[in-house]
UniProtKB/Swiss-Prot annotation:
Organism: Rickettsia prowazekii (strain Madrid E)
Lineage, highest ranks first: Bacteria, Pseudomonadati, Pseudomonadota, Alphaproteobacteria, Rickettsiales
Disulfide-bonded cysteines: none
Residue sites binding tRNA per the record: Y14, Y65, N67, N113
The family this protein is said to belong to: Belongs to the PTH family.
InterPro entries per the UniProt record, alphabetical: Pept_tRNA_hydro, Pept_tRNA_hydro_CS, Pept_tRNA_hydro_sf
Domain of life: Bacteria
Catalytic activity annotation: an N-acyl-L-alpha-aminoacyl-tRNA + H2O = an N-acyl-L-amino acid + a tRNA + H(+)
NCBIfam families per UniProt: pth
PROSITE patterns given in the database record: PEPT_TRNA_HYDROL_1, PEPT_TRNA_HYDROL_2
Protein name as it appears in the record: Peptidyl-tRNA hydrolase
UniProtKB keywords: Cytoplasm, Hydrolase, RNA-binding, tRNA-binding
Catalytic-site annotation from UniProt: H19
Record's function text: Hydrolyzes ribosome-free peptidyl-tRNAs (with 1 or more amino acids incorporated), which drop off the ribosome during protein synthesis, or as a result of ribosome stalling.
Length: 185
């Protein structure tokens, strides 16, 4: 069983913000498998479930807002008894240039409040798919930057990266993490 979490904030006002790239990515991956999300109040998330390549996979989008994502993650992880190595979090990364993708297991949260929330409840030994959103220019406020929409050119770059992740997601299901890592760079 695999748990894939896309980080973001609920609500149409956040739908295309930089901070919601995790939601955008998980929706694209789920749509590749013809899945749709439904609200699960008991888990504080939207969820899509399927058996793909003989493996149960659960996609979630926490509805708790970014800074409380851990509340949803711990409920789903505990209910389904999912191992740490089978947890994948897709999130924005301000320290990576727009569209750059990095995969890693474990490590720090880089100041990302969604990851901090998850780390508090399950530790930091899970997998991360980091999608670069770049840094604000001219010392603009970071919170304001991540909560603003992508420019049209940034959105195109971000979507190319998301498509790259979605097109190679099957490698995760095949337990080929090294190959996935090489394909997404």
């Amino acid at each position: 069983m695999i748990l894939v979490i896309g980080l973001g904030n609920p609500g149409t006002e956040y739908q295309y913000t930089r901070h919601n790239i995790g939601f955008i990515a998980i929706e694209r991956i789920a749509s590749k498998y013809h899945l749709s999300f439904s609200i699960k109040k008991k888990f504080n998330c939207e969820i899509a479930e399927a058996v793909i390549d003989r493996q149960k996979i659960i996609f979630i989008k926490p509805t708790t807002y970014m800074n409380l994502s851990g509340k949803s993650v711990i409920l789903v992880k505990t209910y389904y008894n999912i191992k740490y190595e089978k947890v994948f979090v897709i999130h924005d990364d301000i320290d990576l240039e727009i569209g750059r993708i990095k995969f890693k297991t474990g490590g720090g949260n880089g100041g990302h409040n969604g990851l901090k929330s998850i780390d508090v409840v399950i530790g930091n030994h899970y997998n991360r798919i980091r999608i670069g959103i770049g840094r604000p220019k001219n010392n603009h406020d970071v919170a304001d930057y991540v909560l603003n929409n992508f420019s049209e050119s940034e959105y195109k770059i971000a979507m190319q990266s998301i498509d790259n992740i979605a097109n190679n997601f099957g490698l995760i299901l095949e337990h080929k993490l090294a190959e996935f890592t090489n394909k997404i760079v």
